[in-house]
Design a protein with these regions (language model features):
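Catalytic-core segments of nucleotide cyclases and related cyclic-nucleotide turnover enzymes
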Residues: 277, 306-339
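Alpha-helical transition-metal enzyme core signature, strongest for iron centers
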Residues: 13-21, 40-54, 108-115, 139-150
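Carboxylate-rich helix-loop segments that flank metal/cofactor sites and access channels
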Residues: 59-101
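Nucleotide second-messenger and two-component phosphorelay signaling modules
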Residues: 176, 201-214, 218, 229, ...
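GGDEF/GGEEF active-site signature
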Residues: 241-312, 340
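Conserved nucleotide-binding and Mg2+-coordinating catalytic segments in signaling enzymes
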Residues: 179-197, 206, 218-232, 240
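Alpha-helical bundle segments that constitute or directly flank the non-heme di-iron/ferroxidase center
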Residues: 1-31, 102-122
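Signal-transducing coiled-coil linker helices
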Residues: 130-137, 141-186, 193-204, 254-255, ...
Length: 340
């Protein structure tokens, strides 16, 4: 059900993008000047270049790699369906627009509709795995182009400029909220939700490539005592520094997240089992020898590895459970150690 719902969500976003292209082409046909016609045509052409982006997301959706991206896919579907009706009507109405000012008003209205958080959530998800591949979706650059075109056509009225500024501010807030839904604000690494979204994606790739994957469960020893003796501000700083040390000890292709409290999880999407002990020991030593700290900081680490079969989610959960059991064994054996 989730894979089907996610396919429909991405498909709706693609259709909305296509309606936007149709609207901008209508504005181009009725622009009145060559410069303005070229401006609207260029925006429509850039929208049409997003096809590869949507094709990739549709492929991921069909493989179940987006299943945990939204809390309530049905609600998202309903909202996007209602949005499509409004955007479709707006694009139809643009066919008769001759006024330059009304053309920009219609463009801002369209972009207001397309501020639905789904677009930013998908954009940040793609950027996580494709680097800056979502840069064509740079909303900031796009809004700045609209502002420039307003000024060049002497249409920079207070009302239109205010609408543009509101849209820009709403986009920035959408971006911030999408980030916070997947990242831990304190440490800057994935939170539990973002962590599992990333792991699900990489686990599917590992299954396809038949790679061995690894899981490290890392827990700060006696963290409650640190908070009690030195205060929560010191404890927060320790969490940030431990997260930084772990990040420095793993590859860029590995995934690090805050699993909960003082516990961290590292997912290695491709690993040689014999090297896992070295990775764990490297992290343990780096944290034990962190400079400039008033309290002794050590961690216990549980490590598991295996292959991902057809039941991707179940296999990942089984590996995490195994790593957690190893972590408990490390604690029972005296802490500040790794267990394979």
């Amino acid at each position: 059900m989730n894979a089907t719902a996610m396919h429909r969500i991405v498909e709706l976003c693609l259709r909305l993008d296509n309606h936007a292209s149709r609207l901008y082409l209508s504005l181009a046909r009725n622009a009145g000047t060559q410069d303005l016609q070229g401006f609207w045509q260029d925006i429509a052409a850039k929208n049409e270049q997003h096809q590869l982006y949507w094709d990739q997301l549709l492929n991921w959706a069909d493989k179940g790699m987006l299943n945990n991206l939204f809390d309530d896919p049905r609600k998202t579907l309903d909202e996007l369906s209602g949005l499509e009706e409004r955007v479709y009507d707006l694009a139809d109405n643009c066919a008769q627009v001759r006024s330059k000012k009304k053309a920009f008003t219609m463009a801002f209205k369209l972009e207001f509709y397309l501020l639905h958080p789904t677009f930013e959530t998908l954009s940040q998800y793609v950027a996580t795995f494709n680097g800056d591949a979502g840069s064509d979706f740079s909303y900031e650059r796009f809004v700045n182009r609209l502002f420039d075109a307003l000024q060049q056509n002497e249409l920079g009225t207070l009302e239109l400029e205010l609408v543009g500024e509101v849209i820009h501010r709403l986009w920035k807030e959408n971006r911030r909220m999408a980030f916070l839904s997947n990242y831990d604000e304190l440490t800057g690494i994935f939170n539990r939700r973002g962590l599992f979204n990333a792991i699900t994606h990489l686990a599917h790739l590992a299954q396809r490539n038949e790679n061995t994957v690894g899981v490290l469960m890392i827990d700060i020893d006696h963290f409650k005592a640190v908070n009690d003796n030195f205060g929560h501000q010191f404890g927060d700083d320790m969490l940030r520094r431990v997260a930084g040390s772990i990040r420095e000890g793993i590859r860029a292709s590995d995934v690090l997240g805050r699993y909960g409290g003082e516990e961290f999880l590292v997912f290695l999407p491709r690993v040689e089992p014999l090297s896992l002990g070295e990775v764990g020991e490297k992290i343990r030593r780096a944290i034990e020898t962190m400079p400039d700290t008033r309290a002794s900081v050590t961690v216990s680490i549980g490590i598991a590895h295996g292959h991902v079969g057809r039941e991707v989610d179940a296999d990942v959960k089984a590996l995490i459970y195994q790593a957690d059991e190893k972590l408990l064994a490390a604690k029972a054996a005296g802490r500040n150690r790794i267990e394979l």
